[in-house]
């Protein structure tokens, strides 16, 4: 087979608006279940009720950009399907910028990068939290634009812009560093010299450091204009982070090595596709050595390649507080997308037909991921539906108890819930439940009926102690009134 027919193919031509629209439509199809099926997890239950003020915690944690977008721009209203569709579109746009930074030159390279980035199980898990659907994709777009500016000799603009990214989502720092390493490796492969690649890595890293320094200054000043004090979660503790070394092993064996242990519906097609991408990356590095690249060139390429699997969790070295679950590891989608671009661009220098191999692998990864996204969305829908149905059944008893105690049925109706031994309401694989999570036990009742006034803090604990041992729901006496507060004793 000759390359002549492929030279005229639109796959190897310029990436156009038509290609972008096609990628966007494919991404929408992949997220169709998540867009259509409504689901509310424990965070959604409390964050969608502005009276809770829960969005203030974003500012406490140093995510003041996230706080401004969700708390003020959207008034603590997640905006449903619109927000998810807008978020996917922003991710696709960010993918175009990042692919250009890395050195994509054909529609095939751009398309592979955009789809792997946007159709990602990591972002799908983020999107399960409704409040993230605009802010988190924006953080990726800001990081991609900032890195592009830094590596295009617009250092000051890039560093200033990068300071905004962690204010939206701290994991965007990992996204920026991953793009920098991928761009450096692409330069090394194309120019076959260490100096330009090293220069690009150093410039990018310096820009990130400057951007982070500015972010830290702005974050320290943020209480003056947000009115929200910072919490310990916004601090840096490298020694404490290193003491929690078990997290690093868990991430390496679950994500760098694609086992998917802590990801629901991580299927065999996804696993095989990621392993195939890793094999392609090894082949790219080996091809550099076999073509006379020299030991220094090959070792530096290998170092950059390994770095692509470390930068997605590098913030774990800064703080021991977060457990670094899949939501914090969105940069792995950038790693996988970057490998696809590097493999395509390397292969096409040999023969255009060779570039189809990594493109097929990328397509398989997107297909497997779309299945996982749909299955996860369906499970979350079932769990959320069951949560509300169960809460509705209890709500009838709450009204009866309030009426018998002479409480105003116009509201507010103070409420405390005891739910100490949670069990799954999911029909399939999702274990979490909004009814049982500590911070949403009372708020799910208010989500159904705004007359409910959740009791929190010390008063809640006092009431639960006064309640003592009571029958468990749905037995008689499991819903009762103490000091003008309705108490629901689930278990």
Residue ranges and their predicted role:
Residues 59, 63, 108-151, 167-168, ...:
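Membrane-interface micro-motifs in multi-pass membrane enzymes
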Residues 2-60, 64-65, 70, 74-116, ...:
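Intrinsically disordered, polar/acidic, low-complexity terminal segments
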Residues 136-162, 179-189:
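Specific aromatic-rich, kink-prone transmembrane helix
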Residues 93-95, 265-298:
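Hydrophobic, aromatic-rich transmembrane alpha-helices
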Residues 176-209:
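Perimembrane helix-loop-helix junctions
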Residues 200-279, 316:
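Membrane-lumen/periplasm interface segments of specific transmembrane helices
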